[in-house]
Amino acid sequence: MSPIRHFVLALAYLLSAAPDPAQSASPHDAGHDFDFALGTFHTHIRRLVHPLSGSNKWTTYDGTKSDVAILGGQGSLEQIEADGEKGHLELMTLRLYNAVAHQWSLYFSSSKSGQLDSPSVGEFDNGVGTFLDQESYNGRTILVRQLWSAATPDSYHFEQAFSADFGKTWEANFVADLKREHG
């Protein structure tokens, strides 16, 4: 089976698990799903040095994450600057909500690449945001999954994982715990 077909099937599975809005007790404005992330946060990042290699060597970074609403709240722009053992990170995420599809598209970039990656697409269900995309990594077609969870008014958790077997197994490679900065 082709890698694209595997990706489409994995995405279809994710979407089939989404609740039927017509059966919902009250309407949910999914365009505000990322409001918990707006503002300035301290971020502690753990990053797997060599993903999908069998290595379990991690490195850490600490820094600041800022996030502002754009497009009347139907999107947001996140910027991360962090320093650690392996140097300086500058990362950006552009999040856009498609009200017709009831899904978010997340476009990542870094100061290293200088371009937007293909989007991760997904939604929130029961307080967990799950987003998937297919990418090429070291010459291999992989799935990438991002999870946002444990959101409170002052903190949340993010985890990115790769799958080289089209979603059968996942290896976390970027984990961030964020705490809101006050003052």
Predicted regions and their residues:
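Bacterial N-terminal signal peptides
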Residues: 6-17
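N-terminal secretory signal peptides that target proteins for export/translocation
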Residues: 1-3
